[in-house]
Amino acid sequence: MASILTLDGLYAEVPKFLPEALREGCAGKNPLSFYIQQILNLMGCDGNEYHVLFTSSSEEANTHMIMAAVRRHLLRTQQRPHVIIGAGEPPSITECVKALAQEKRCVYTIIPLKNFEIDPVAVYDAIQSNTCLACISGTNAVVKTFNKLQDISKVLRGIPLHSEVSDLVYQGCIKQNPPADSFSINSLYGFLGVGILGMKKKVMQGLGPLIFGGGLRGGSPNIPGIHAMYRTLTQQRPSIKKINTIHKLFMKTLKKHQHVYLPIGGVSAEDMSTKDMSTKDIPSTDMLVGPKGLPGYILFSVGHRAEELQKKIFTKFNIKIGRIVDLQEILFRIKIPQKYWETLLFIQLRDNLTKEDIKRVMVVLMHLDTITPRGSLPPPSYSSSFS
């Protein structure tokens, strides 16, 4: 990604592939029940209360849980089921729910972000008599902020909460039981084709045969991939203290230096004339409306490669309208000393950050936390600001 305001590099160390773990898994020394118990232990789960199903990915786990909850509701009542999802959920959740809605199998409500988090009060206000499931991830998929799952679970009052908790599990944030009725975890490798659908046994019993009869991946379990996931969780977890430090610094900096925004709802071509939008503010000619509920981004434009990375960002998040400014202008207006310019430029132009990169980022974040912006760039008139 192309700016210091993406947490993929700052937030946690990326787990490395362990070829020896894959070989150990191929040896088949441990039965499947061993991994079920060990992964439950790593999450602080009581084996008497939780059960684990291994799937081909977290995407399959998410889709399977949503389908089971919707089908159960349709079998039991004449009402069309209602699903609550948070803004910035993984595509496997949003696309599944939207596809069901197009088929008139369910209706849904998207909870917008407030201060980069899902507000439990907004979740409570969205509850309807036919609400059958809420899907709120442990970390926001866009800016990687923590969601208050425990508070959200309380306001749901018995409505099942499904959560994608890969980041929380890998970082060791869950000390005792995931604050959700069901949860999904990816392989931490992607290409190994293994994921987890975990759930409370009472939820599983309520779903009945639907949770098993929905067509889970056929064939024998991917024991080598499951073993590699287990080894990653036990050996490669980053320091939670370091993660929390970076996260707090990042959030303080993000809330303090608000300069350039992308519109949350997008802007139509008809609105351009009324809002004095300059054509130079538009990255390309084929503009579409951006998704609702996404937070703002700060995007820097320096050099040919940076522009290419920006196009990738716009494409990835389906955002087609935004103001792009010059990095030097940003740095000058918020009084960042020139000695830090190279670091920010370096971070912008790298796709993956190393441990040394993270140390350099920490220096910049700590400096930004000690200064007061002067003459910060105002948000464009057509754009929504952070709350």
From Swiss-Prot:
Major subcellular site: virion
Upregulation: Expressed in the late phase of the viral replicative cycle.
Cofactor(s) essential for the protein: pyridoxal 5'-phosphate
Subcellular location: Virion
Residue sites binding pyridoxal 5'-phosphate per the record: 58-59, 184-186
Pfam families: Aminotran_5
Family: Belongs to the class-V pyridoxal-phosphate-dependent aminotransferase family. NifS/IscS subfamily.
GO cellular component, one term: virion component
Organism, scientific name: African swine fever virus (isolate Tick/South Africa/Pretoriuskop Pr4/1996)
Family matches, as InterPro entries: Aminotrans_V_dom, PyrdxlP-dep_Trfase, PyrdxlP-dep_Trfase_major, PyrdxlP-dep_Trfase_small
Name assigned to this protein: NifS-like protein
SUPFAM superfamilies, per database record: PLP-dependent transferases
Keywords: Late protein, Virion
